[in-house]
Structure formats: structure tokens, C-alpha cells
Amino acid sequence: MIDICVPLIDLRRTEDAFVQDLFDAATGSGATLVHANYARCYVDLNRDSRELDPSMFSDGLPRTVAVSSPRVEAGLGCLPRVASRGEQIYARKISRAAGERRLSSVYDAYHSYIRNKLDDLVKIHGLAILIDCHSMPSRRQRQRPLPDIVLGDRFGSSCDNRLTSLVERSFRDLGYTVSRNAPYAGGYTTRCYGRPKRNIHALQIEINRNLYMDEHTVEPSASFQKVRTDLITIVERLASFSHRMKQSLTV
């Protein structure tokens, strides 16, 4: 048994709540929608699996190698130690076996599917576009409010600049404020899979939670449907863009 020492609502506030519902119409444009069945506080799929905090485990690391990073030091590694306000999630250390179960059954399974899907798309179509969809708080601690949308392409290294420009322009056309790579330049998923020279393009989209939900209660707001409808437009433009890219490969 793993004892949790924070209220459930604090764990929910760490989630990318309802993002899969915002994008659920993407399949209508021919996209494949892959969403996590576990919350970020259980396993953070947008981390390297080696980003593990040794202090969390009672009998050693689940895997032989751990990688230190500012995220791990802050308690936000692949298996997070802290919740939304920095409070400790667990009342006591968890076992190595419990950590390994999360990594093998959730993390490894998810990323194996992503890798295989991207490989299949490249074999069939000559290219693949991965849009890594997330939500972000409306402000970071005591800093100024964040923009509506933050696009992360690892400063141009994870996808064709035309893709980032198209998405940025599309959001602006719909009335959203947009930032590139600040404060989020793209996480592990974007860095790991974005290989433009191999025709695999990865772009991270962070959506301000204040646009579509009540951040305190973690419930959809009255504007949820508008944001969802706008995202259908974005996905349709992405589909058209990918079709043009595919055609250019055959010329």
C-alpha cells in the first residue's frame, strides 16, 4: 500500500485535465489521438525515465541509472515527489518494485506505442507529425499571467519552422495570445521524437487552463466548448499542412 498525504484535489491540479477531451475530434481529420490513462502525479510521461529521485525509494532505485536534473531536484521527475503547491505526495517512501511497475506498465508501454506509431507513419506516408498536447497554469507562482498558448519546438530543432509558424498564426487568427519556447520550450517527448531530418516533426502545445476550466475546482468552464471548436480548426489546418508536406516529398 502507498500512503498519500495530500488532498486529491491537489493531485488533480497537477494534471493536464480535460486535454484529451479538447482534442478528441482530431481523429475526424485523420489524426491518431493517444492519451494517458494515468495522471502526471503517478507517472510523468514527458520526462526521461531515468529522471528518478533516489530519496523516494525505500530499497533502491527501480532502474540501475538515475539522471539528476533541476526537475528531479524540484521533486518533479518521472515519478513526481511533490504536488501542485510543492507539498510532499507520499507519507513514506515507496518500494523499488512499486516504482518499476509504474515505469514498465505505464511509461514503457506508452512510449513504445509512440515510437512504433511514428515509425509506421514514416514508412507509409514518408513523414510524421507529433503534437504533444498539455495544459499549463494561468500563472507561474507570483509571476505575470502566462499567454493563452505556448508553442515549444526546442528553439527550432524538433520540427520544421513552417509547422510552428502555421500553428502560431492559426491560434492568433482565432484571437489567442501565443508565445514560442517561453516559458516552455518542449519537454522530453518533443526532444526525444522530433527529428526533422528524418521527417519526424514534434511540436508541444501548452494551453492555458484558465481558457477552458476552473483551476481551483478542476471543472470545465463555460468556454470549454469554444476552445474545443477552435482546436478542431487548428487540427484541420495541421492536416492540410501535413498533406502538402507529403506531396512535396514526392516531387
What residue ranges belong to the model's regions?
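N-terminal catalytic or cofactor-binding beta/alpha core of small enzyme domains
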Residues: 1-130, 135-203, 207-251
